[in-house]
Each structure stands twice: as structure tokens, then as C-alpha cells.
Amino acid sequence: MDKNFLEIQNGSFSASEKNKVNNVNLVIKNQGEIISLLGPSGIGKTTILRTIAGLQKLTNGKIILKGKTLSSNSVHVEPEERNIALSFQDNSLFPNYKVIDNINFGKKRLNGNGSSLKSNEIIKLLRIEPILEKFPHQISAGEAQRVSLARS
């Protein structure tokens, strides 16, 4: 039987006493599958994503990622090891950095070598080569969102 890439079983998450999400069940069958969480403000979409990415703790239930069970009392898995990136509506690009520098910013901090083959493939896939030398205020909202995806 094939393992799912990600599964949440009766997951509960809490960003604060006010912002609680209970009994979430979710299955993502394949790595690379694109999903969207939709709902009104304050319903817990960001809390769920932050927990999956390892930025918040699971308070109850299980998250199974690539066959490895994560629970509120499990061994911590670093966010980088989860290999999950988040991209939100507010892309928060650095206004004084060119697009290419925005894309490579985190990579330079993590490994010191800047753009990688994978970054170049993503740049081509997202068709943002023509805007790499522009600043965020010089590009459209859609282009800014693609830059945010490339950076993540």
C-alpha cells in the first residue's frame, strides 16, 4: 500500500486560547500536490499550515509526514527537514532588493551559495526571468506572488 505524503488525523492546533482548531482530518496523497485551504478570516487556515510546517506545535492528534508520525509528544522534526514552504497572500518582498535577491535571500542565509539549480528551474517554471533585475514596486501583484512562490 502506498503511503500518503501528508496525513492529519484528528489534529488539534492552537495559536492562542482564542484561535483553536479541533479535529482536522486531511490527506495529501502525493508530494508536489497543490492544495488550497479556503475559509473566512480567523478560521485557522494559517494555524494549520504553520503546524504542518513545524512552526507551531500540534496539541492533539497525529500528523504523518512521509510515513513518519509526528504528535504533540514526538521527536521534533526541524522545519527545514519537513521540506514544506508556505506562501501567503501578503508576499512581504523586501522593497530594496531586486527580485533575484528576494528569491535568493533565504538560500544565502542557509547555505551561503545563493542561487541553485533548483532555484533556476523554478524561475523558468514560473516565467519570471524577465523581471529578475526589477524591484518589487516595479512588478505586478501577480508577478510578486510568483516571486514569493519562487522564494519559498
Which residues does each PLM region occupy?
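ABC ATPase nucleotide-binding domain "signature" region
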Residues: 36, 86, 147-152
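The feature captures the beta-strand-to-loop junction immediately N-terminal to the Walker
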Residues: 38-40
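Helix-to-loop junction immediately C-terminal to a conserved catalytic motif
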Residues: 53
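Conserved ABC transporter NBD signature motif
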Residues: 61-72
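Conserved ABC ATPase "signature" region
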Residues: 68, 114-131
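ABC ATPase NBD coupling module
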Residues: 70-85, 109
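Conserved ABC ATPase signature
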Residues: 135-145
